[in-house]
């Protein structure tokens, strides 16, 4: 039974082989969100079974080398008023998830379409190795969605700026994905590099993406190519 004044939040994520993370990723939303939507892009482990056992709505999506396409598919399945789109290797800082409904209630009558939250990258010892802001909570509206195959950007489909509320002092997202075996696998199979190259084929004037390409070559130890792309960007 829906409670009066309840803010309906759809927690969304896209996953593949995330059995080590999916339980924690879904746990923060229990008792907070209205529905949990998991879009699986081809898991070979127990990700789907675990998500289903926790009550999530699981959908299957054929991977098309495009993170934005998969995320927009997940959004299309959401029925809540707001969407919280965190990755499977992300969660809110302790106690922050519980603040979310109250923050959204305060924004209900405003023009805010999205919320800027703090974002922290954790190393293998759980220490903060990088920090910034991310827009992961936004209204469920047809004119909002993601673009780019990788390093996705949320925005209005017509390209005009979103109205963003600042909640960086109240909400922080913790990310643990760029470390350990999972990160080494991404580097070895070149997934990120290949997707960036495809994105630049489609959008050769994307200077920000050129910078990301420089980052990939730098991480791979190819300093000459890294410098070349940094200069281009």
Where do the language-model regions lie?
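Mobile, glycine- and charge-enriched loop segments
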Residues: 3-11, 80
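Short aromatic/hydrophobic "clamp" motif used to bind/position activated sugar donors
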Residues: 83
């Amino acid at each position: 039974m829906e409670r009066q004044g309840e803010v309906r939040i759809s927690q969304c994520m896209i996953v593949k082989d995330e059995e080590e993370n999916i339980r924690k990723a879904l746990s923060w939303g229990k008792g907070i969100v209205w529905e949990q939507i998991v879009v699986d892009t081809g898991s070979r482990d127990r990700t789907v079974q675990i998500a289903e056992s926790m009550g999530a709505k699981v959908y299957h999506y054929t991977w098309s080398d495009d993170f934005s396409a998969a995320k927009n598919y997940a959004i299309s399945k959401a029925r809540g008023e707001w969407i919280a789109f965190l990755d499977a290797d992300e969660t809110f800082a302790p106690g922050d998830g519980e603040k979310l409904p109250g923050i959204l209630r305060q924004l209900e009558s405003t023009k805010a379409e999205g919320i800027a939250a703090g974002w922290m990258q954790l190393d293998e010892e759980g220490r903060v190795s990088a920090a910034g802001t991310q827009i992961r909570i936004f209204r469920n509206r047809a004119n909002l969605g993601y673009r780019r195959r990788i390093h996705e950007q949320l925005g209005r489909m017509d390209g005009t700026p979103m109205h963003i509320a600042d909640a960086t002092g109240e909400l922080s997202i913790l990310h643990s994905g760029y470390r350990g075996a999972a990160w080494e696998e991404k580097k070895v199979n070149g997934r990120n590099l290949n997707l960036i190259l495809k994105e630049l084929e489609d959008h050769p004037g994307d200077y920000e993406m050129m910078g990301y390409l420089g980052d990939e070559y730098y991480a791979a130890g190819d300093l000459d190519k890294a410098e070349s792309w940094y200069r281009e960007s």
